[in-house]
Amino acid sequence: HSEGTFSNDYSKYLETQRAQDFVQWLMNSXXXXXXXXHADGTYTSDVSAYLQDQAAKDFITWLKSGQPKQE
């Protein structure tokens, strides 16, 4: 069943790649909208960017694990 293993690994790779592309697209979309920031909103913007990065990393880790989402 080596062909099945390769197909499964390749499918997981493609899913991970699509997820990373999607997250990158989301981050680029959000960054373009927040281009006009005020000085008092800089800290909030930086925290939001950090949280978005962390959420993206957690999401990709979850996708790679192949585990069902826990509710």
UniProtKB/Swiss-Prot annotation:
Expression triggers: Produced in the A cells of the islets of Langerhans in response to a drop in blood sugar concentration.
Pfam families membership: Hormone_2 (PF00123)
UniProt entry keywords in alphabetical sequence: Hormone, Secreted
Localization of this protein: Secreted
Matches recorded under InterPro entries: Glucagon, Glucagon_GIP_secretin_VIP
Domain of life: Eukaryota
Entry's Gene Ontology cellular component terms: extracellular region
Chief place where the protein resides: secreted
GO molecular function, one term: glucagon receptor binding
Swiss-Prot/TrEMBL GO biological process terms: response to starvation
Family: Belongs to the glucagon family.
Note: X's in the sequence were included by homology with other fish sequences.
Protein name (database record): Pro-glucagon
Lineage: Eukaryota, Metazoa, Chordata, Craniata, Vertebrata
